[in-house]
Regions:
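N-terminal secretory signal peptides and thylakoid transit peptides that target proteins
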Residues: 2-21
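Low-complexity, Gly/Ser/Thr/Pro-rich intrinsically disordered linker/tail segments
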Residues: 232-240
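C-terminal segment of N-terminal export signals and the immediately downstream linker at the start
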Residues: 27-61
């Protein structure tokens, strides 16, 4: 049987080109993903979606760090918490209720640690935004000036808390009574157990920065405060 060469018409070529262009456009959209989707739950708690793509905070925090930090570490806390509370009365509680009710109980240390780390990380992701930093909204800025003198005063205290925390932990801007304060917590601990309202946090566990900054925690903390701090989120927490 004799094969005849396919005749390519001008119209066919135009349609094929249009199809390839459409495919390329779809591929380009897929290559720059939007905010991540929440992971399916294997228990009462779900790994929440990131509020941005994993590469959104580059170059301050790399997509490699975000992939490990969010996809491995944070997910691990959620998975471990689900394993620990499924089938118990704690499964029907909120994270905040679990944190405050298990704090200081030796037989529930693992539950407390995983619940608090889940909460802390979810709060940390929201404390960051691409093109962050700068001047906070007016009401928050007024409160900062009253408590720290100015933004430079707040920056000094936040970086001091972040760099002086021995080992793993967190630096926090909190509302303590009617004044703002900076505090730090070790390991999984949270201001929630102290009756303080968290407004913003910087994670100073090594897994938050070591791939990008090695042992230069001070550089990481300064870059987060100056370039990623989500002051709109902090202002919303102040009003809540």
């Amino acid at each position: 049987m004799t094969e005849h060469p396919t005749k390519i018409t001008r119209r066919g070529l135009m349609l094929a080109s249009a199809g390839l262009a459409s495919l390329a456009s779809a591929f380009a959209r897929a290559a720059t993903p939007p905010a991540t989707a929440a992971s399916p739950a294997n228990g009462p708690f779900t790994l929440p979606a990131l509020p941005y793509a994993e590469n959104a905070l580059d170059p301050v925090i790399s997509s490699t760090t975000m992939g490990f930090h969010y996809g491995k570490h944070h997910k691990g806390y959620v998975d471990n918490l689900n394993k620990a509370v499924t089938g118990t009365p704690l499964a029907s509680m909120s994270l905040e209720e679990i944190i405050t009710s298990t704090y200081g109980q030796a037989d529930k240390t693992a539950i407390y640690n995983n619940a608090s780390q889940d909460w802390n990380h979810s709060f940390y992701w929201k404390s960051l935004r691409a093109d962050g930093g700068g001047t906070p909204p007016a009401a928050l800025k007024q409160k900062i000036d009253a408590s720290f003198g100015d933004m430079a005063g707040l920056r000094k205290e936040m970086l001091a808390a972040a760099t002086s925390q021995f080992g793993s932990g967190w630096a926090w801007l909190v509302l303590d009574g009617d004044k703002l304060a900076v505090t730090k917590t070790g390991n999984a601990d949270s201001p929630l157990t102290r009756g303080q309202k968290p407004l913003l946090t910087i994670d100073v566990w090594e897994h938050a920065y070591y791939l990008d900054y090695q042992n230069r925690r001070a550089d990481y903390a300064a870059a987060v405060f100056d370039k990623l701090a989500n002051w709109g989120f902090a202002a919303d927490n102040l009003k809540a």
